[in-house]
Amino acid sequence: MKDRAMQTVLPLHEATFGEYTFSTEPSRIDTDWAIEALLATYWGKHRTADMIRTSFEHSLVCGLYKRNRQVGISRIITDYATFAYLCDVYVDPAERGNKVGTWMVDQTLDLPHMPKLRRWVLFTQDAQDLYRKFGFENPAYPERVMERHDT
């Protein structure tokens, strides 16, 4: 691979659900809103704003909008061939409870031009039931899963 110019880029995708719009258009992301939202989560509270900006630059960021105001976000880290990590799935608390979060996850996992991947992973402390609806399961062989935490 000569340079990052060879990086896979999917065509933009947009879909609607009532008054909500899901979009993969990077310019629509309200970065300030997303940073504030993620810093308030249990998984993002130890990040910095710069870490979040950098993570957005190196992944596929999806936005959820209600009348053009950002109310949700999801992010995919992938090689576009075999593996993807779903992360930073967040919906504004005022918008929860009306299936829009489930719809956003569905849109994120089923992007029209995303190749069929061998494996998707995610980490969640409290949303296992939501992700089971999309085929996620506890690891069949947890002894094969390892992780490393850098400080």
Predicted regions and their residues:
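Conserved active-site alpha-helix within GNAT-family acetyltransferase domains
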Residues: 114-150
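Conserved acetyl-CoA pyrophosphate-binding loop and the N-cap/start of the following alpha-helix
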Residues: 95-104
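Short amphipathic alpha-helix that is part of the acyltransferase structural core
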Residues: 3-47, 142
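A conserved beta-strand-loop-helix scaffold within acyl/acetyltransferase catalytic domains
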Residues: 50-90
